Amino acid sequence: MRILGIDPGSRKCGYAIVSHTSNKLSLITAGFINITTTRLQEQILDLIEALDCLLDRYEVHEVAIEDIFFGYNPKSVIKLAQFRGALSLKILERIGNFSEYTPLQVKKALTGNGKAAKEQVAFMVKRLLNITSEIKPLDISDAIAVAITHAQRLKPH
């Protein structure tokens, strides 16, 4: 099963596709969608086109999105909500459903501590997937962490 993890952002949207088979996780690809245009409508279209390409290329079965963190200023929260709404609609059209995880849930799933620093999450991502190289920017490791969190929820108890 292929899981797409998404860490939405107003400038960079982190993504990761993780394979989950027989209780084994492996990273297929990860990166970020760089949002460079200035008009909101163009930004949303660029984001959706990039998502479409990922869904086409990697035959994703499940999608998990990190919830918006509300510590930002109100303008940023509104913009992120618009991006997230557009992403959600496209995912519903293409996949049919998606799961959402708060930053606290993701941090707790990977480190055991809901207040862990991003660097601790990145360390655990590398450890769980046997990645030796650095994962930069942290938007990418966050997206991988979202996909891993979802995979852990899919495991039989």
Swiss-Prot record:
Record carries keyword DNA damage: yes
Entries under Pfam families matching the protein: RuvC (PF02075)
Enzyme class: hydrolase
UniProt: Mg(2+) 2 binding residues: E66
Enzyme Commission designation: 3.1.21.10
Positions contributing to Mg(2+) 1 binding: D7, D139
Gene3D superfamilies cross-referenced by the UniProt entry: Ribonuclease H-like superfamily/Ribonuclease H (3.30.420.10)
GO CC, alphabetical: cytoplasm; Holliday junction resolvase complex
Principal location: cytoplasm
Superkingdom in the source lineage: Bacteria
GO molecular-function term, one example from the UniProt record: crossover junction DNA endonuclease activity
GO biological process, one term: DNA recombination
SUPFAM superfamilies: Ribonuclease H-like
Chemical reaction(s) catalysed: Endonucleolytic cleavage at a junction such as a reciprocal single-stranded crossover between two homologous DNA duplexes (Holliday junction)
Oligomer and partners: Homodimer which binds Holliday junction (HJ) DNA. The HJ becomes 2-fold symmetrical on binding to RuvC with unstacked arms; it has a different conformation from HJ DNA in complex with RuvA. In the full resolvosome a probable DNA-RuvA(4)-RuvB(12)-RuvC(2) complex forms which resolves the HJ.
Function (record text): The RuvA-RuvB-RuvC complex processes Holliday junction (HJ) DNA during genetic recombination and DNA repair. Endonuclease that resolves HJ intermediates. Cleaves cruciform DNA by making single-stranded nicks across the HJ at symmetrical positions within the homologous arms, yielding a 5'-phosphate and a 3'-hydroxyl group; requires a central core of homology in the junction. The consensus cleavage sequence is 5'-(A/T)TT(C/G)-3'. Cleavage occurs on the 3'-side of the TT dinucleotide at the point of strand exchange.
NCBIfam families reported for this sequence: ruvC
HAMAP family registered for this protein in UniProt: RuvC (MF_00034)
Name of the protein this chain belongs to: Crossover junction endodeoxyribonuclease RuvC
Lineage summary: Bacteria, Pseudomonadati, Campylobacterota, Epsilonproteobacteria, Campylobacterales
